[in-house]
């Protein structure tokens, strides 16, 4: 795993000296992604910069890498897990190789399959390939969005980078996207492909693109996460799931450097660890928790590790450590991300890096196998399907006048509201009606439903559970789960691999019918059945906490003064009604409401603003800033 920057010049440059210096400065911003070495390639059409974290073919796997008399050049972030099989296939067709790296195999795959190359890959990746003969730049991002890829157009040049902070070096200004900010306040992340900078976008997962001289960037989707449930015997599906996970974990452990695994108290990471231990008996595991009672899975993780006969290394985080590291962590995010669980992920990655270079983790299991409690909702709302639409409207009016917290109010609201109007994913922080009080430039014509309506349209033939999974895969998973997984581990120069988010595993998971996702009130039912006899009994049906954080308690106690000062000193008055935010904090401390997630969401934006706009709380790594800030 690594990081890269690049530029495509629509008109060839007469000289490249200035561009070479710019690429070096951009590359310097992501040293944490690849501390082992750097590399560069330039011609009149493209400039490539690369930072390497050595994983496969440590001696000869450097980049940028060329193939076939320097006709093709590549910069690549990620891992291709089927590179051995692809190499054998290409060798049978007459291709030869000079290294043992997956990078060279990827380049040869493009040489042979051209724009069909991305669909041949099994892995996590973002890459750029320059074809010198045809003057074509080709790039792609992996199917689920495990690896990031940002881009921006400045005059006649298109810039790319593994992290948005590199693009800030090339830009002369930041234009804060107020629509993206408004959506952030509901989702707790900026929904892709947007970023909080109006000039910068993300290449979407499962898509590829080409650029030709004097032409625009052209995108094409090569993978869609489509669900296709089938009715078949439970035992058959259990075996297919188990076999797919064993196969995925096996190929995800291909590495020339030490591999470990994160371990919480739930089924996801425990399943990964239990299987990985069979391939690598000396596997090290890593866990994190807090002193606050009920907010640590360290003891459960240690019990799991002991049952498997492997080592567990844990870290307990104090509120002081959390506060001290938060500005640096927000800088690593690139865009504000208000998931409190991102911070313990940063700390467990920091601890793991002392022992290994690669770590496995359980991201994606909830979205693929039906693990969130909210996925049980469609079953509980079945009786409402028989109620005529006119009566549902009347019941919604009744619910509207019921006091907040009154028993039955929420049930009526959910049961009488279509799924596409009430569900936007796993997090809904600020409702539209409340955002009017928060944001000074609230746009009443913009709704969080604008983000999800495309995904509901694409999944219109699905069951409600599959619709929810589809929405989560396209919003929550890529915007929150995978963003924090990449940014928090790469901040510590640690490669994270997620075996559940594998094309082979998804192909099996997509066939699971609803009744085998949630059964008898149990989430991820089929995954748990597949784990029987493999995962220690004490964790098999245990509810997952993940990386829980005692934010609700801290905002009233250890963090209260610190948070209050940030709100009062923040220079976000152009965007935020700060008096309203302070009132949220007062009500929270007085136990009038649990406003912890709302306060945290605004707080993270304020810290982001202080780093990117106000130039305060700047980590040492932040050596380049844009020259001008534009508020729109």
Swiss-Prot record:
Domain of life: Bacteria
Pathway involvement of the protein, from the record: Amino-acid biosynthesis; L-asparagine biosynthesis; L-asparagine from L-aspartate (L-Gln route): step 1/1
Catalytic residue positions: 2 (for gatase activity)
Protein name: Asparagine synthetase [glutamine-hydrolyzing] 1
Keyword Phosphoprotein: no
tRNA-binding in keyword set: no
CDD domains: Asn_synthase_B_C, AsnB
UniProt keyword list: Amino-acid biosynthesis, Asparagine biosynthesis, ATP-binding, Glutamine amidotransferase, Ligase, Nucleotide-binding
Gene encoding the protein: asnB
Domain Glutamine amidotransferase type-2: 2-214
Catalyzed chemical reaction(s): L-aspartate + L-glutamine + ATP + H2O = L-asparagine + L-glutamate + AMP + diphosphate + H(+)
Enzyme class: ligase
Species per Swiss-Prot/TrEMBL record: Bacillus subtilis (strain 168)
Signal peptide span: none
GO molecular function, one term: asparagine synthase (glutamine-hydrolyzing) activity
């Amino acid at each position: 795993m690594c990081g890269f920057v690049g530029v495509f010049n629509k008109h060839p440059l007469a000289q490249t000296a200035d561009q070479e210096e710019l690429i070096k400065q951009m590359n310097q911003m992501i040293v944490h992604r690849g501390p082992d070495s750097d590399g560069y390639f330039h011609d009149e059409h493209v400039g490539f910069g690369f930072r390497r974290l050595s994983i496969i073919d440590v001696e000869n796997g450097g980049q940028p890498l060329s193939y076939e008399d320097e006709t093709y050049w590549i910069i690549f972030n990620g891992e291709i897990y089927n590179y051995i099989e692809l190499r054998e296939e290409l060798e049978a067709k007459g291709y030869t190789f000079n290294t043992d790296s997956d990078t060279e195999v990827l380049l040869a795959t493009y040489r042979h399959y051209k724009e069909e190359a991305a669909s041949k890959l099994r892995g996590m990746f973002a890459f750029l390939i320059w074809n010198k003969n045809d003057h074509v730049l080709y790039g792609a991002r992996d199917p689920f969005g495990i690896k990031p890829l940002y881009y921006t157009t400045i005059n006649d040049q298109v810039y790319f980078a593994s992290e948005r902070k590199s693009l800030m070096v090339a830009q002369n200004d930041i234009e804060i996207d107020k629509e993206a900010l408004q959506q952030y306040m509901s989702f707790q992340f900026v929904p892709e492909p947007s970023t909080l900078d109006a000039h910068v976008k993300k290449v979407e997962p499962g898509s590829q693109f080409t650029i030709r001289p004097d032409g625009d960037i052209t995108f094409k989707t090569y993978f869609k996460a489509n669900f296709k449930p089938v009715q078949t015997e439970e035992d058959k599906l259990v075996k297919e799931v188990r076999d797919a996970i064993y196969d995925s974990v096996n190929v995800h452990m291909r590495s020339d450097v030490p591999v470990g695994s994160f371990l919480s108290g739930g089924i996801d990471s425990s399943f990964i660890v239990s299987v990985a231990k069979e391939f690598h008996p000396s596997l090290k595991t890593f866990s994190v928790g807090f002193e606050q009672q009920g907010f640590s899975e360290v003891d459960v993780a240690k019990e799991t590790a002991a049952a498997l006969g492997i080592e567990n290394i844990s870290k307990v985080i104090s509120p002081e450590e959390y506060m001290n590291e938060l500005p640096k962590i927000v800088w690593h995010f690139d865009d504000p991300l208000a998931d409190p669980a991102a911070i313990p992920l940063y700390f467990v990655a920091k601890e793991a890096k002392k022992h290994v270079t690669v770590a496995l983790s359980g991201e994606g299991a909830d979205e693929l196998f039906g693990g969130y409690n909210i996925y049980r909702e469609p079953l509980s709302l079945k009786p409402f399907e028989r109620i005529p639409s006119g009566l549902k409207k009347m019941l919604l009016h009744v619910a509207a006048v019921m006091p907040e917290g009154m028993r039955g109010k929420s049930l009526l609201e959910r049961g009488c509201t279509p799924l596409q109007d009430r569900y936007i994913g796993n997090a809904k922080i600020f409702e539209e009606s409340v955002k009017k009080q928060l944001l000074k430039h609230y746009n009443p014509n913009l709704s969080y439903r604008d983000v999800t309506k495309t995904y509901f349209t694409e999944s219109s033939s699905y069951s409600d559970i599959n619709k929810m999974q589809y929405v989560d895969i396209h919003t929550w998973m890529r915007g929150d789960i995978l963003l924090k997984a990449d940014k928090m581990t790469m901040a510590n120069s640690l490669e994270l691999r997620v075996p559940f988010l594998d094309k082979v595993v998804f192909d099996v998971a997509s066939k699971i019918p609803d009744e085998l996702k949630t059964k008898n009130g149990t989430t991820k039912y089929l995954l748990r059945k597949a784990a029987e006899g493999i995962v220690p009994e004490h964790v098999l049906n245990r509810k997952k906490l993940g990386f829980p954080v005692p934010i609700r308690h801290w905002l009233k106690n250890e963090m209260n003064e610190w948070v209050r000062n940030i709100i009062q000193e923040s220079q976000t008055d152009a965007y935020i009604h700060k008096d309203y935010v302070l009132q949220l904090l007062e009500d929270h401390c007085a136990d009038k409401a649990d406003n912890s997630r709302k306060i945290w969401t605004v707080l993270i934006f304020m810290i982001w603003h202080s780093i990117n706009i106000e130039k305060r709380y700047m980590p040492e790594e932040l050596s380049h800033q844009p020259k001008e800030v534009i508020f729109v």
